[in-house]
Amino acid sequence: MTLKINEKNNVDVIIITTGGTIEKTYDEFDGSLENRGTSIKNRILSKLRLPYTNIHVHPLMSKDSLYMDDQDRAEICQTIESESQKKAPIVILHGTDTMALTAQYCFERIKNLEVPVVFTGAMIPMGFEDTDATQNVTEALLAAKLLSKGFYISFHNQIFEVPFVRKNKEKRTFEAISK
């Protein structure tokens, strides 16, 4: 893939946020962790040095992926199709429980994709001291700029091609499955 570089020699990357653990916030009143909108700009992106990357955040939904259904997945697909017309790589923030399912759903339905679409999430919410969110987002941003068109999951320093990936709940990460 040839990256679309703008007039300032920067690369545009689109981040579509859907919720999941990566975006959960702690409610001091009742002690719960809830999806209440995106905070990726303040919690991660503002801390990264990305002088040659223009990030465009598209907040789509704010849901725990366990509560996503095919209507939500269809909305994610439609948003990918719409945003991909801008010819910029796409990163999807998604809950890990159904990330592989959503990625495969989109892989099966979007046939003329011209950009890389990289799904990522976290086991521990951003904003928590031992979060894996910063690592996973940083790696997904770089992967989106380097990979060819197609669907991928980027997680814990690994890139997995969709649909050959699944979550390993025991190891608390993702792993490749046979082609």
Q: Where are the predicted features?
A:
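Active-site histidine-anchored catalytic micro-motif
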Residues: T2-K179
